[in-house]
């Protein structure tokens, strides 16, 4: 191996070893479902999970089921004909409250599903804010030039190589992801060389919902595939106990 052959004359270093970066702080924002939303979530969870054989859970089936529960946490869910059906605005309301608390500071907002993006755009249209959905290199330039107040992005579309550190230092996870790599790389768009402020990562977490299991798995930084299946088994056991 080349690495072994030159180990006596070379030192392998990670960026964290030689770059001085500001702190990265996490702000977990609890989101309480109203009575109607909580009932809808409970009913869907029961319908989905009681059909599952715990011994037959695979990563694929777990991903589909938890994906539906994460959609419901966010406030809408796709029907069988791929139409988004709105269920509640609890997380949207919590998001807008957080935006107001930032007092004009710019925010990079990560969504998970297309209906998340559409509902966020609709909700933000009522405010005097410059909102953009990331889609091209010009969005990166405009963000860093301070010309965008709220930049919406899917974590898969803004991973490696994107530099957003000059446009803001707040990242809001409206929709959470089971992908640790996507999560870490998305956060690094702000937390990188050239960032002058502590980076604050805001998680919007529905209390009692699948959001809580995702955040726990991300914080533990373990095997996300096993964490996903374990989270599903735990919720099935609770329903059947």
Regions found by a protein language model. Name each.
Residues 99, 108-112, 123, 142-143, ...:
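A generic "structured core" feature
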Residues 178-241:
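A conserved SF2-helicase RecA2
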Residues 163-176, 200-203:
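A short beta-strand element within the Helicase C-terminal
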Residues 106-110, 115-160:
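Conserved helicase ATPase core of P-loop NTP-dependent helicases/translocases
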Residues 40, 116-120, 160-163, 182, ...:
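Phosphate- and divalent-cation-binding pockets in alpha/beta enzyme and binding domains
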Residues 1-84, 88-97, 101-105, 201, ...:
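Inter-lobe coupling linker of SF2 helicases/translocases
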Residues 36, 115-116, 138, 159, ...:
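Short alpha-helical
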Residues 110, 153-154, 173-175, 204-205:
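Conserved beta-strand segments of the P-loop GTPase G domain that flank and frequently precede/overlap
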